[in-house]
Amino acid sequence: GVGAAADALLWGDANPSGRLPETWPLRLEDTPCYLDFPGDGRHVEYREGVYVGYRWYDARKMPVLWPFGHGLSYTGFVYRNAQLTADEFAEGDSVRVRVSVKNVGMMPGKEVVQLYVADCTGTTGRPPKELRKFVKVKLEPGEEKQVEFTLTAQDLSYYDETLGSWYAAPGEYKILLGHSSRDIHATLSVRFSAPRRRPFVIDENTTIGELSKDDRT
């Protein structure tokens, strides 16, 4: 039961390997919904948009108590030899991401390797990074294993309301590998090419930065 499991963890007979599915803030006032909850009567507005959870805290560069994906262990893990099978790929193709993970402690343990993607194309309204893949790997003391992920255009995409479909802008993306959203051990760069480009509309709200980043202006 729960008591036996807690006893095994406290005495070191078992090694924890769970990860937090949410961010623990330092203060309730730091949460994105603080000013909107409990709302007016039965009406509550959710204004976060895509900036939910760790995306909100990352975008505002806010310190947190425990980050998304964080977890405890009686052992330690080292990441090394992170690499891509290609520096560039196109829509319809894929690229593999590989990294070696080693248990450098004295106990068997399980590490959850998390892969985040950061859009560096200049697309507005995207979080600093987004979790796209993860895998749990079991390692004996001193054991090392290679972890592999396959990335496609879908892993770089966001839903574009103007296009009415999922879309990945051509350009550079960062691939971040780590223990949690705030504990990144390796960063790689990959370029994505696609024949379809999002329509660039210039109006009174267009910024100088947006104009300078687009080669069509």
Predicted regions and their residues:
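Beta-strand elements of well-folded, non-transmembrane domains
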Residues: A86, N103-G105, D119-T121, A153-D155, ...
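Short acidic, flexible loop segments centered on an aromatic residue
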Residues: M106-T123, K129-L131
